[in-house]
């Protein structure tokens, strides 16, 4: 779960839940275009427990949690130092050095840890890609196979083809993939986005009738546990450079809903002609709160302090009282408008977790 209200916790039981509306006509029409569906569940896995990471993030001075030690796809992955440095090593991202640990005796048997999805040749599958990462945004791609994006965060969109796809924490996409290449086993990987390092995630797509074993490129790839600071991965297929924003902008510029009936209230945005030519710039930054010494996220130099009740509860009560106008006609108590130009002074508001 990606949290927008407080610190999230990534310990314990995790997994996907897909809730479908059997009466949704868009979903019914989409279902005619694919043979079956599979889940791609993405996770960055920290080897420290959540309490330890939480304590560091909430301390003064701030202690950064660093990069995850492993990346999992559908719960499987490899902590590559087991393969390259021996049975008594672990990567310490804060130093960085190798430190003693015990690795599983069968760690070198790649098939034991990397998951495999078996597909029928010539069939089209819907892949529900779920970004369950705690921190790291990634780019997902399948060796020698393009993807067609058909759904984003539960909304059916106009289809468009991509070679790879950015998945940030909390995001969900559905893509259609036709497995019409030469029968074999193909590697899919993740590449880090907007961070200079991250372990790589792996999953295999195996055509029915393919031989045993894994692609030789995978044997080489697991010997490179972290993508270097230059941001290039040795994985096949290639991913964008970690700090290249163009692929993300291009992706989001193509996202258009198939059914505008889902947004009946959008017209209020265009009631004022000025709204069509207004440019709003929101800059996110981290600042130190003088009273506590803690780091805080801010938007245009304005940050927020959480109240006792969730903001959604306060907002609901405000707009459902007698005589209240629909938002934004009714002001939400404890909130303020982010200024269009950042104030020179850092402002701490008493709003409830979100600035409107």
Where are the regions a protein language model picked out?
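Beta-strand-rich extracellular modules
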Residues: 4-6, 132, 191-193
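Extended terminal and domain-junction accessory segments
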Residues: 10-58, 160-355
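Short aromatic-acidic-glycine turn motif
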Residues: 25-27, 146-156
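Acidic-aromatic/histidine active-site loop/patch
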Residues: 36-123, 130-133, 295-297
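Exposed beta-strand and adjacent loop surfaces of beta-rich binding modules
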Residues: 124, 135-139, 355
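Asparagine-centered strand-capping/turn motif at beta-strand->loop junctions
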Residues: 129-133, 350, 356
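Short acidic, flexible loop segments centered on an aromatic residue
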Residues: 131-148
């Amino acid at each position: 779960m990606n949290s927008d209200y407080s610190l999230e916790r990534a310990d314990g039981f995790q997994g996907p839940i897909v809730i479908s509306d059997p009466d949704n006509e868009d979903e019914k029409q989409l279902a005619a275009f694919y043979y079956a569906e599979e889940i791609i569940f993405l996770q960055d896995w920290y080897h420290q427990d959540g309490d330890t990471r939480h304590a560091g993030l909430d301390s003064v001075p701030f202690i950064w949690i660093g990069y995850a030690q492993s990346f999992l796809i559908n719960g499987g992955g490899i902590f590559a130092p087991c393969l390259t440095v021996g049975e008594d090593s672990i990567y310490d991202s804060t130093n960085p050095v190798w430190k003693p640990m015990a690795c599983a005796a069968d760690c070198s048997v790649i098939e034991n840890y990397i998951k495999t999805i078996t597909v029928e040749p010539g069939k089209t599958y819907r892949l529900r890609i779920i970004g369950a990462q705690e921190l790291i945004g990634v780019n997902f791609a399948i060796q020698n196979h393009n993807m067609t994006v058909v759904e984003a965060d539960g909304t059916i969109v106009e289809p468009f083809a991509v070679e790879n796809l950015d998945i940030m924490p909390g995001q969900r996409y559905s893509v259609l993939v036709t497995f019409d290449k030469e029968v074999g086993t193909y590697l899919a990987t993740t590449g880090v986005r907007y961070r200079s390092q991250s372990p790589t995630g792996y999953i295999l797509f195996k055509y029915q009738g393919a031989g045993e074993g894994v692609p030789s490129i995978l044997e080489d790839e697991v010997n490179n546990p972290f993508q270097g600071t230059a941001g290039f991965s040795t994985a096949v297929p290639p991913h964008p450079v970690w700090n290249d924003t163009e692929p993300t902008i291009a992706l989001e510029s193509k996202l258009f809903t198939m059914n505008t009936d889902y947004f009946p209230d959008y017209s209020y945005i265009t009631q004022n002609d000025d709204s069509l030519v207004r440019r709003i710039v929101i800059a996110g930054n981290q600042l130190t709160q003088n009273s506590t010494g803690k780091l805080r996220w801010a938007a245009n130099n304005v940050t927020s302090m959480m109240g006792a009740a969730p903001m959604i509860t306060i907002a609901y009560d405000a707009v459902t009282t007698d005589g209240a106008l629909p938002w934004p006609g009714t002001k939400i108590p404890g909130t303020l408008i982010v200024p269009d130009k950042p104030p020179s002074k850092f402002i701490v508001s008493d709003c409830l977790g979100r600035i409107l």
